[in-house]
Amino acid sequence: MLVLRSGLTKALASRTLAPQVCSSFATGPRQYDGTFYEFRTYYLKPSNMNAFMENLKKNIHLRTSYSELVGFWSVEFGGRTNKVFHIWKYDNFAHRAEVRKALANCKEWQEQSIIPNLARIDKQETEITYLIPWSKLEKPPKEGVYELAVFQMKPGGPALWGDAFERAINAHVNLGYTKVVGVFHTEYGELNRVHVLWWNESADSRAAGRHKSHEDPRVVAAVRESVNYLVSQQNMLLIPASFSPLK
């Protein structure tokens, strides 16, 4: 009897001490790197577009002395016109907070650019994004035009749609007519949204490449798989500003 009790006690003890498996709400590779990218979109009054851009051309150096400007574009096609789109890079949220505080106290920046340009802006939007784990920021080989393609995905994150989406992106890249600058996933803003920033030599070379891709069985197969996770999509053709780091 004592032997039986001893064996039962050991069995219960081992069950009690067994490690517990904890569930996680993570939906993809964890974001250990704090670096993020802020997408800012300004809708301008049509009569003020040129004045706004001229002001920034003269004063953008005041702003870029505080944080890195990735690119600055005007929207040529896709949605509302008289619109500009720009991307800013930050090390982390504390870095952005420091930059915003410093800019608010920069008299030269406030007086020469912010105050005159505020009256020219009709609406502002901002999103905080991270690069998808398998993407990195790439600089195009030469000047060109850019396309921002925005994909609204089904909830689940990169763990759900990441592999299929990557295959669809690479299928286009492998045809050689376009380059990926970066693939971004929204952290603040419209969630489950993916932004793909493409570079093309020209709008015509993009059009020719797209026509070719529609007839390529590898692209067709990859896209068919990826659209299973897609809700909607839209795009814009972007023209880089003269002061944009990405030309």
UniProtKB/Swiss-Prot annotation:
Pfam families: NIPSNAP (PF07978). The modification N6-succinyllysine is found at residues 45, 57. Disulfide bonds: none annotated. GO terms for biological process: mitophagy. Gene3D superfamilies: 3.30.70.100. It comes from the Eukaryota. Belongs to the NipSnap family. PANTHER family: NIPSNAP-RELATED, PROTEIN NIPSNAP HOMOLOG 3B. This is Protein NipSnap homolog 3B. It comes from Homo sapiens. The gene is NIPSNAP3B.
